[in-house]
Design a protein with these regions (language model features):
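N-terminal beta-strand motif that seeds the catalytic metal site of vicinal oxygen chelate
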Residues: 1-22, 78-81
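Vicinal oxygen chelate
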Residues: 1-6, 92-130
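Core segments of cupin and vicinal oxygen chelate
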Residues: 16-57
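Short amphipathic alpha-helices within nucleic acid-binding modules
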Residues: 26, 89-94
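A short, acidic/glycine-rich surface segment
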Residues: 36-38, 44-46, 60, 65-71, ...
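Mid-chain, well-packed structural core segment of small domains
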Residues: 74-89
Length: 130
């Protein structure tokens, strides 16, 4: 089967957070992402933290005065970020044990796989999916 895509894979996803301590604690200490690089950008008065996510990266920008994300009605652009896990049930238990609230586990209508959502400190929806 011929590969028609001009892209190899996703290199990174960029997330904007508003609070350095809360966002770093959430993504590094609670979710377990490894810091690859961390830089304070004086000219912008913000931080950029690059996190390892498998072979991809998450760029976590901390911008104090960034406008709040519009959730309802849904706006154009990125809707949520989904992470593949071996077991949604096991991952939910780990998240809940760390104080992270998750929605009830449900089956994806189209794949039949288990999935659920939770939110980061700035209310970005995050999904786990088998």
């Amino acid at each position: 089967m011929e590969d028609k895509s001009m892209f190899d894979t996703i290199h990174h996803i960029a997330i904007i957070g508003s609070d350095y301590e809360k966002s770093k604690h959430f993504y590094v200490d609670l979710l377990g992402f490894e810091i690859i690089r961390e830089n304070y950008r004086k000219e912008r008065d913000d931080y950029k933290i690059d996190l390892a996510c498998g072979e991809q990266e998450i760029e976590l920008f901390i911008i104090k005065d960034a406008p709040a994300r519009v959730n309802y009605p849904e706006a154009l652009g990125l809707r949520h970020l989904a992470f593949k896990v071996k077991s949604v049930d096991d991952t939910v238990k780990k998240l809940n044990a760390k104080g992270i609230v998750t929605e009830p586990v449900r089956l994806d209508d189209y794949t039949g796989k288990k999935m659920t959502f939770f939110h980061d400190p700035d209310n970005l929806p995050l999904e786990i999916h088998e």
